């Protein structure tokens, strides 16, 4: 994970001029494997970054995670880290399994009382080959939410409704499918949610 790049992007791009001096924003992290760290996410959520490490990755302590560095640069505090390794935004997971209990949609109500929400998702939707679906911004059916586009729209709608005072940002990983990239940009624009595209 591009930890230094993430931190630089957040420091330069997100919070500049947003807060008054002395404010400490409550920041919630909403993600998948790249946003996990053992001891920092709810018990029972699947973990990718363990303490001590198990997966031969280069993250060995929480201070190395992108989100910890970002929060530090923003002068904030962690409100909640609701991240779950392998989770998809929509309710379709790997091998077409039903992920409706662990998807971003299922977990969006667990973010506490944040001033800012940083969402890092869609990677597993791309890698799992989840159905893309059609753009739909209201009247979602249960079946709609097994496809990426309507699920992302429903997710943003729920977040806006449940956290009306929070600034919301979406971080889009690099090397995802063109359909996922296009979908994220389109739905972010519809809901006026800034999207930060990672490179390389």
Model-inferred region functions:
Residues 1-5:
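Positively charged n-region of N-terminal signal peptides that target proteins for export
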Residues 99-200:
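Alpha-helical cap/lid subdomain in secreted, periplasmic
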Residues 7-17:
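Bacterial N-terminal signal peptides
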Residues 19-23:
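Boundary at the C-terminal end of the N-terminal hydrophobic targeting segment
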Residues 30-31, 171:
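Short hydrophobic segments within beta-strands
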Residues 26-28, 37-137, 141, 178:
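Conserved SGNH/GDSL esterase-like catalytic core that processes O-acyl groups on lipids
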Residues 34:
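Active-site glycine-rich loops that stabilize anionic/oxyanionic intermediates
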